[in-house]
Amino acid sequence: MSNTAKFFCTRVLLLPDITLDDNESTFEELQARITRTIDILRSVDQSSLDANKVAEDPVIMETKMGNFRFESGQTYLSEYAIPNFHFHMTSAYCILRHLGVPIGAFDYLGDVFHKV
C-alpha cells in the first residue's frame, strides 16, 4: 500500500522519483516506512496540482511484468490505486481473522459509520 501511494505521487502527480528500499524486516522498520509514506503524501503541494492534467493526461505504469496504460490519472486512481489498496487491506484483514485476531467489520469499516 505504501508503494501504491508513492507511485501515485510519481506517476500521476509527476513528483520526482521517490526511493523506498523495500527491505523492512521488523515492525519498527515497517512503522518507519508508514511514517515516511505519510510524509510523502503530506509533502504534496496541493496548490500546484493541475486537476486537468490529472483528469486528462494518460499514465504509463512501468512494471517488471510490462507497461500498462491508463487513460488518465483519474482512471489510474479509480481502476488501480484504490482497488489495489482495498485488495491488500482485505487480505490483511482476512489473514488476521484466520489467525484468530479478534477483529470484526467495525475494525475494517469503523470510519464509515457515524453513530447517531
Region roles according to the model:
Residues 1-15, 67-107:
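Short, contiguous alpha-helical
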Residues 6-71, 96, 109-116:
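Aromatic-glycine hotspot motif
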